[in-house]
């Protein structure tokens, strides 16, 4: 959202959900001029508890939007753009189910148009019309490497042998996957690879919970990323000190979701580790399903690359399992000597 606002030089056409619903939602009397709203990452809508905490309205964002639509004079269209498996924050765990729950308490009949696979999720709608044209299943992010999302899904499911098979397919399509324990090797590689390419974008990504990466140059602590200038980070030219290409500032899953880089350097943190047969995490995070939220965070991070990605794994014995798992999944080892 901030990247679009920065690029368009406008805060009117693209707004954040929280601000929009503070103005027009709940029991407010103000009415928007628009009858069509596009909700990017609609599966990440806040539930009633989170909405109460954020803006004092004990009503979920889906219900708030639909009730607002019913208050309009004649008609309303809610377009939801959905990225499955990308619920990454507290209050988002219910996913698309919240939209069906909201439909179930509406006063007016709502018609849902969706891909066939999602049709069973909207049993509370007055009518469900499925159309496969709404299933946007061809990625524009990975330059025709269409198996990238499948590789990431298999990795997070712990199916390393299937990842190995898919990695050969991806590399054949020109998508590069590297793993390194030398952060300087990663920095050297992206700078050399994209030397002179003024439209190229590469940068540092890390999980918001990976505090151990601070000592390796990943500035992913909360206060830093909260004040980060996300628009310039993605859009400024490489020579700008605010650009991602400066390799100074780090974007987390919250800043980079829905956007992409040519070659991200992804720091793997202590918030998700390999057990030998799958992935695990701490249960101290204040969410309903901490493991799924962490898996989804890494799903976002690992699917940002257009040309590929580099995963940096700290050179500490604790992370040996992660490094070997990524190698077994088909990631090529990158060292400073190799660069």
State each model region's role:
Residues 87-93, 110-270, 274-279:
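Conserved helicase/translocase motor-coupling segment
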Residues 1-6:
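Conserved Walker A/P-loop ATP-binding site and its immediately adjacent core
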Residues 14, 78, 133-135:
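Conserved beta-strand scaffold positions in the cores of enzyme catalytic domains, especially
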Residues 7-71, 248-252:
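Conserved RecA-like ASCE ATPase "motif II neighborhood" in helicase/translocase motors
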Residues 43-125:
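Signature of the SF2 helicase/ATPase Hel1-core->accessory helical subdomain module
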Residues 95-103, 125, 216-221, 320-330:
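Short, aromatic/basic amphipathic alpha-helical patches
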Residues 77, 249-339:
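C-terminal accessory regions
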């Amino acid at each position: 959202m901030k990247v679009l606002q920065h690029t368009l030089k406008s805060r009117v056409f693209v707004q954040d959900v929280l601000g929009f619903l503070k103005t027009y939602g709940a029991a407010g009397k103000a009415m928007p001029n628009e009858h069509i709203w596009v909700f990017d990452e609609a599966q990440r809508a806040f539930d009633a508890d989170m909405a109460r905490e954020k803006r004092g309205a004990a009503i979920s964002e889906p219900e708030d939007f639909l009730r607002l639509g019913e208050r309009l004079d004649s008609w309303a269209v809610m377009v939801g753009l959905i990225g499955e498996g990308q619920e990454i924050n507290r209050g988002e765990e219910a996913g698309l189910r919240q939209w069906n729950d909201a439909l179930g308490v509406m006063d007016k009949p709502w018609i849902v148009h969706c891909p066939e696979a999602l049709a069973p999720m909207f049993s509370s709608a007055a009518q469900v019309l499925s159309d496969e044209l709404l299933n946007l299943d061809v990625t524009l992010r990975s330059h025709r490497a269409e198996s990238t999302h499948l590789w990431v899904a298999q990795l997070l499911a712990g199916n390393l042998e299937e990842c190995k098979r898919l990695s050969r397919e991806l590399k054949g399509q020109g998508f590069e996957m590297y793993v390194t324990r030398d952060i300087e090797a990663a920095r050297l590689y992206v700078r050399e690879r994209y030397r002179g390419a003024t439209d190229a974008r590469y940068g540092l990504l890390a999980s918001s919970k990976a505090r151990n990466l601070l000592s390796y140059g990943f500035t992913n602590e909360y206060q830093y990323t909260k004040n980060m200038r996300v628009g310039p980070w993605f859009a400024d030219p490489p020579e700008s000190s605010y650009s991602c290409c400066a390799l100074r500032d780090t974007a987390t899953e919250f800043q980079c979701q829905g956007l992409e880089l040519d070659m991200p350097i992804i720091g793997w943190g202590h918030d998700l580790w390999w057990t030998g047969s799958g992935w695990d995490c701490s249960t101290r995070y204040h969410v309903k399903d901490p493991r799924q939220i962490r898996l989804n965070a890494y799903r976002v991070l690992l699917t940002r690359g257009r040309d590929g990605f580099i995963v940096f794994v700290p050179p500490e014995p604790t992370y040996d399992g992660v490094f070997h798992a990524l190698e077994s999944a088909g990631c090529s080892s990158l060292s400073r000597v190799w660069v």
